[in-house]
């Protein structure tokens, strides 16, 4: 049974500026493993932008806002074939367990100007029904992340 679907799109240039700038944006958003996996790629910014989009899509699929679960609690890893997979930690992993999530499908795509991701969560319905999303759950902007006010 599908428990949640999330979709996100990112303008790569807008994300690329803070990735290469001062302020620790990359370290606040990505895990060390994600940064290492993309470090030597020719399409580094696009690859990180796709991972950023997947993190956002995962939060949407879980019905969580950015303030409820940090982006570093969603890690995008590759399986043996190189396909993207989600690894959840902290409160987001607990939330997924409570909701009965058993499998996550992740699809990433990018072009020079945009990156996008879709996350589909499957599992069995549990008694812990997913609460309605808070009205302000998505009330933030990329600038909020850049300024570290989340």
Predicted regions and their residues:
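Core catalytic alpha/beta fold that binds nucleotide/phospho-ligands
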Residues: 1-150
């Amino acid at each position: 049974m599908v428990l949640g679907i999330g979709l996100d799109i990112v303008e790569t240039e807008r994300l690329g500026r803070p990735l290469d700038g001062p302020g620790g944006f990359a370290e606040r958003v990505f895990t060390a493993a994600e940064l290492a996996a993309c470090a030597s790629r020719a399409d580094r910014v696009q690859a990180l932008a796709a991972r950023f989009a997947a993190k956002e899509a995962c939060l949407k699929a879980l019905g969580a806002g950015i303030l409820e679960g940090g982006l570093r609690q969603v890690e995008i890893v590759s399986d043996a074939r190189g396909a993207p997979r989600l690894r959840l930690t902290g409160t987001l992993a607990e939330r997924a367990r409570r909701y009965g999530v058993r499998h996550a499908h992740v699809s990433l795509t990018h072009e020079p100007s945009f990156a996008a991701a879709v996350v589909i969560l499957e599992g069995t319905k549990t008694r812990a029904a997913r609460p309605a999303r808070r009205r302000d759950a998505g009330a933030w902007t990329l600038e909020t992340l850049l300024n570290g006010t989340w």
